[in-house]
């Protein structure tokens, strides 16, 4: 409707929209790419991946979320999600008689032109076929006992033609059924032929030497959606093996249990004058992971038992050791049973190679002497990471991180040595050796009761996928009074945006140290 008021020269237009009846979603139908193979998971697990129930309104985000869930579970080699939507029905447009006559006349002219073009093309093909009498490949069907070439070509194409026609006919029926019922079918085709995978990564640090890490994963252990992965890491000073068994609870991605266990062997050099330590640790625990499907906070509630064995290397009088060594027990076993709760949230524009993102993590662990722990303690930890890029092609990039921790205890000397804080290395203060920074007593590194480290970095993209970096790291592991000095380093590096994630090569110097040590660090993985 339109109303025009001449004196005010204002037109008032009222528009009415008829949106029609809203379409609903059917329950997802799952199929295997090989029809002879059964579905690898029970229907309950598969249904939990769809963020809707039958009868919910159709929305693209729901179908897209299903596709993402199928990929992120890592259960399948590939998936194909198909929604059967009917073509929109265009209502007949009512026109004035003179306009309708013009359109009909135009359609007749177009039809006559098309017919004349088709006739000319057919005549050209006949002339061409009469001229083409040479044959490069002998067709045996043209000899005795064979079909005429035209009949052979037709027979050869018939199976594919029938197959295509059947699929097209089935789809047309589904589309017509969808139009009538107002319910959209969603058909998912799955392939799970390769359930086992093996990945290997490498790293290098002047302090740790070369590092090799391998991960084995079994995507589907049984029809209930259980999964298993194991990791092995080997370097000059550290060797470890750990495993994780995942059990879906309410959702394979957003609510599940993990059973974890592992063994670690680490050499700690220069702990004190003429003394090194060999630390062996065994860990066993369980946790429940709860994630918000919309990318909000992730919660982890867990229980972890840790048994450490410390063996000294070197000749030293036991009386020369600080109390922090004597009480915790060098050449002895130390244990802790920690109840933990972790809260984390990550926002980023890419999981593999983010250019913008922010991650925050908060964790609380509690242990008591009355239950398999050497000390009464509460360990509080907070961590923050950010990446921010700007400018043309996001050439300018800023990266930062901060980590803080504190051990609340009535007697720090009883806290197991391996739960205390040490810093240094490519994940904390570059330019310093791995875990070389700590409060000292009589020249012995006794470990910190507090931790505070940070980093600021600027990257410039000088070529697509390549960035030059300059950075500074700062902080330390501190005693209760924060009396030991803050250390800091500066460095430069190179970044490459590889298909497997960022690859970083850094050279850093601990300039707060009188010796100005220079260290080389090589690392693969996101900085979030």
Model-derived segments and their meaning:
Residues 59-62, 68-354, 358-361, 378, ...:
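Gram-negative/organellar outer-membrane beta-barrel architecture
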Residues 269-271, 309-317, 374-376, 395, ...:
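Outer-membrane beta-barrel and related beta-rich outer-membrane complex signature
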Residues 475, 483-503, 514-515:
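C-terminal structured "cap/appendage" subdomains that terminate the fold
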Residues 1-18:
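Post-signal-peptide, soluble extracytosolic/periplasmic N-terminal scaffold domains
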Residues 30-35, 48-57, 201, 229-230, ...:
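Second-shell loop/turn segments in exported
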Residues 259, 280-286, 360-368, 375-408:
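Transmembrane beta-barrel strand/turn architecture of Gram-negative outer membrane proteins
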Residues 1-4, 22-27, 311-320:
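Interfacial loop/beta elements and low-complexity acidic/Ser/Thr-rich segments
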Residues 391-471, 479:
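Extracytoplasmic gating/loop element in the C-terminal half of outer-membrane beta-barrel translocons
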